[in-house]
């Protein structure tokens, strides 16, 4: 019945927030004893994943639960996600696939043994130091901040939202499309090939996700 469903939801959320989350952030999957964890690739204990179904996806889930129940327990869980995403937000306003609470040096160290050996995942093979539109990580995070801000108009969520909006507008090319990564990386080509991440990108619904976010902002 409804009471059992609500109790199960709260138990699951409490487990995720208290036992699984890393300062409000998440990866994709974990061993039962939490000794290893993965996003699209294996992560270190200090890392979180932005790329769905990672941290922003959990934020949307908590907001959905809050809307369904009116229980602030879920809103507070969403706020913890927001804290992690504010840490992970690039100064330009977008997000990378991943973030590391241990700092940039630790993140760069991850790229050496793990990222650079990412077969078929070329974008993980180099630390670009910028943000990506690939796989909707930036779009999911931006939409989450929009929803969170609109919910209670808490001013602390207006700044990351405004930065995300500016990022999407600043990175759009005059013909209307977006690159895969922004700001433009310098000398970032792989395997002797020119860098492709500044090219107009339609893969993984880059343009569609950005347009959807902007339409949500307008509405």
Report the location of each language-model feature:
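Mature N-terminal segment immediately following signal peptide/propeptide cleavage
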Residues: 2-24
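Extended ligand-binding groove/face enriched in aromatic
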Residues: 19-218
């Amino acid at each position: 019945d409804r009471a059992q469903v609500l109790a199960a939801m709260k138990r699951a959320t409490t487990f995720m927030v208290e036992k699984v989350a890393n300062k409000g952030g998440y990866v994709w999957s974990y061993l039962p004893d939490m000794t290893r964890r993965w996003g699209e690739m294996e992560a270190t204990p200090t890392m979180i994943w932005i790329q769905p179904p990672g941290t922003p996806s959990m934020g949307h889930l908590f907001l959905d639960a809050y809307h369904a129940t009116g229980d602030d327990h879920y809103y507070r869980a969403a706020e913890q996600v927001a804290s992690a995403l504010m840490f992970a937000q690039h100064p330009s306003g977008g997000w990378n696939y991943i973030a590391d609470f241990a700092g940039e040096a630790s993140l760069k160290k991850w790229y050496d043994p793990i990222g650079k050996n990412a077969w078929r995942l070329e974008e993980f093979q180099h630390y670009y130091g910028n943000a990506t539109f690939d796989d909707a990580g930036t779009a999911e995070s931006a939409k989450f901040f929009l929803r969170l801000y609109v919910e209670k108009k808490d001013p602390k969520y207006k700044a990351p939202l405004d930065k995300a909006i500016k990022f999407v507008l600043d990175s759009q090319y005059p013909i209307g499309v977006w690159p895969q990564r922004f700001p433009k990386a310098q000398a970032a080509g792989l395997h002797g090939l020119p860098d492709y991440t500044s090219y107009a990108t339609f893969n993984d619904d880059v343009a569609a996700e950005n347009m959807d976010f902007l339409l949500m902002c307008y509405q």
